[in-house]
Amino acid sequence: MTLYSAALLLTTKLGPDGRHHRRHSTVGRGFHLQTAGVHHPNSGRSKYEVQVIAFSSELAIVSLPGEIFVELGLALKKASPFPHTFIAELANGSIGYVPNRSAYAEGNYEVVSARCAEGSGEMVVEGAVKLLKELR
C-alpha cells in the first residue's frame, strides 16, 4: 500500500463535541501510518492534520501542514518515544507559520502573519506526541 493510498482511506466522523474527527491507522510495507485531524465547521478555525509514520521502534516521521517554530520542533523531538523522530513541514497542505507561545510577545513577522492563535503550536506538539505514543 502506498502512503497516498493509505491517506485516502481516512474516514470522517462527527464527534460528541460537534467537530469532524478523522483518524485512520494502517500498516504497510515496513511502516505504520497514524493520521488525525480536527476541523470545527463554521467556527473560524482552520483544519490542521497531524500525520505520524513509524518505520520501526526507532524511527518515526511527523508531517505537519505548516512551518513550526524551532522550539516546537525541539519539544516534539524531546517528548517523542522514538529515538529518531524527523519532522516534515508543509506536508499535506500549509496553514503558514505556527509560532510557539512565547513568540507572540515579540510580534515578529512570523507571528504577525500567523493564522493560528497563541498556544496553537503547543497544541500541535501535544497532539503529535499523543499519536507517536499510540504507535509505540
Which residue ranges define each predicted feature?
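Non-catalytic substrate/cofactor recognition surfaces at enzyme active-site rims
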Residues: 1-136
